UniProtKB/Swiss-Prot annotation:
Top-rank lineage group of the source organism: Eukaryota
Name recorded for this polypeptide: Transmembrane protein 11, mitochondrial
UniProt function note: Plays a role in mitochondrial morphogenesis.
Family: Belongs to the TMEM11 family.
Subcellular location: Mitochondrion inner membrane
GO cellular component terms, A-Z: mitochondrial inner membrane
Organism in which the protein naturally occurs: Gallus gallus (Chicken)
């Protein structure tokens, strides 16, 4: 875990604001940098290998200098986030539409939304769930980025990944998609069995 934090200013401190920020060094297990160093024809393969090793080693921060691999990784994470959010929002729409619309019309919105939620959840489960990249998010916060040793990089636009626990996120979209599935099966049974 990163060794950064806020410390209160003591009585002998010159900071009159009551709280100052101090920089503390990161340990070597917190941050890994995939440097953009071209050594031969297989440089891209080497970058991909280094990134894969860093993801599997579960570093807290991963800085990706090579633009192509950084952009691909950021897009992959963005697509996974989109699938997650779509599964949650569509499932929520499926479950709450019957409460907001008349019974005769609610299934025209809730059933497609439920199917969309289940499809996104299934696709996420197949393509992203076991990928080590799904444990990371792209960091955009300037303050958090200022804590990292980015001054040593040769690239002006590195992609910075931060490891985050996604257990609650997966539970949320799986629970909502499962509830949407139950609702859809029940509603289809009611529509066609009666």
């Amino acid at each position: 875990m990163a060794a950064w934090g806020r410390r209160r200013a003591g009585p002998g401190s010159t900071n009159s604001g009551g709280g100052g920020r101090e920089r503390v060094t990161l340990s070597s297990t917190d941050c890994y940098i995939v440097h953009e160093i071209y050594n031969g024809e297989n440089a891209q393969d080497q970058f991909e290998y280094e990134l894969e090793q860093a993801l599997e080693a579960q570093y807290k921060y991963i800085v990706i200098e090579p633009t192509r691999i950084g952009d691909e990784t950021a897009r992959w994470i963005t697509v996974g986030n989109c699938l997650h959010k779509t599964a949650v929002l569509a499932g929520t729409t499926c479950l709450f539409t019957p409460l907001a619309l008349p019974v005769d019309y609610s299934h025209y919105i809730s059933l497609p939304a439920g199917v969309l939620s289940m499809a996104c959840c299934t696709l996420y489960g197949i393509s992203w769930q076991f990928d080590p990249c799904c444990k990371y998010q792209v960091e955009y916060d300037a303050y958090k980025l200022s804590r990292l040793p980015l001054h040593t990089l040769t690239s002006s636009t590195p992609v910075v990944l931060v490891r985050k626990d996604d257990l609650h996120r997966k539970r949320l979209h799986n629970t909502i998609a499962l509830a949407a599935l139950v609702y859809c099966v029940k509603k289809i049974y009611e529509l066609y069995a009666v």
